């Protein structure tokens, strides 16, 4: 990632964490199709590796705006993909992909973080990884903690996430017939890969 700042990358991770943690409400649905969001997407597309993934997400958002009962349909997609059994779903948990669910707990402790009691999901949920990455990128931008320490923890987090994210994304593509969450997951995968290469 060359054109995006640490804070901008942190914002993308925080935004993705929010979208993968719960169904979109009416306000989020309006926001994702707003002119402000179009500007944000344009900024993300200035990073060449993200361009195709953002284009696809914009296509899904455009289709979403003309979808009947868009919020209800998207909520059904979210539920079917992320809350059902793993037979025809893309469960957003490291443990669903035979990964060590304790790894994220160790990473959170190392970062001096803990999960919120308001988030009623297991600690190995995708959103927790993304919130941690967001926190680490914000910390890099602040310069209060040695960058080497933050970067080491960022790489550990990315490595742990990369163990199962490709399979999660493949399952999103396989089972998300509308394609919004498939496009969102593809953007996440490209972001994580670019972030990992930016050592």
Curated annotation (Swiss-Prot):
Xref: InterPro entries: Chaperone_TorD (IPR023069), DMSO/NO3_reduct_chaperone (IPR020945), HscB_C_sf (IPR036386), TorD-like_sf (IPR036411), TorD/DmsD_chaperones (IPR050289)
Chaperone listed as a keyword: yes
SUPFAM superfamilies, A to Z: TorD-like
Domain of life where this protein originates: Bacteria
GO CC entries: cytoplasm
Iron recorded as keyword: no
GO biological process, one term: protein folding
Subcellular location: Cytoplasm
Principal location listed in the UniProt entry: cytoplasm
UniProt keyword list: Chaperone, Cytoplasm
Homology family: Belongs to the TorD/DmsD family. TorD subfamily.
Role this protein plays: Involved in the biogenesis of TorA. Acts on TorA before the insertion of the molybdenum cofactor and, as a result, probably favors a conformation of the apoenzyme that is competent for acquiring the cofactor.
PANTHER family: CHAPERONE PROTEIN TORD (PTHR34227:SF11), CHAPERONE PROTEIN YCDY (PTHR34227)
Designated name of the protein: Chaperone protein TorD
């Amino acid at each position: 990632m060359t054109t995006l700042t640490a804070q901008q990358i942190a914002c993308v991770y925080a935004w993705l964490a929010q979208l993968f943690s719960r169904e979109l409400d009416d306000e989020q649905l309006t926001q994702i199709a707003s002119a402000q969001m179009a500007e944000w997407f344009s900024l993300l597309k200035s990073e060449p590796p993200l361009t195709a993934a953002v284009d696809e997400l914009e296509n899904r958002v455009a289709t979403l705006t003309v979808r009947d009962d868009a919020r209800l349909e998207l909520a059904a997609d979210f539920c079917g993909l992320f809350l059902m059994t793993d037979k025809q779903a893309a469960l957003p948990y490291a443990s669903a992909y035979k990964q060590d669910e304790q790894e994220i707990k160790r990473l959170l402790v190392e970062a001096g973080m803990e999960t919120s009691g308001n988030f009623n999901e297991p600690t190995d949920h995708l959103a927790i990884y993304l919130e941690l990455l967001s926190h680490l990128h914000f910390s890099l931008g602040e310069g209060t903690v040695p960058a080497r320490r933050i970067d080491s923890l960022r790489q550990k987090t990315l490595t742990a996430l990369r163990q199962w994210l490709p399979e999660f994304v493949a399952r999103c593509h396989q089972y998300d017939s509308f394609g919004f969450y498939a496009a969102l997951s593809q953007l996440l995968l490209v972001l994580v890969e670019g972030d990992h290469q930016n050592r």
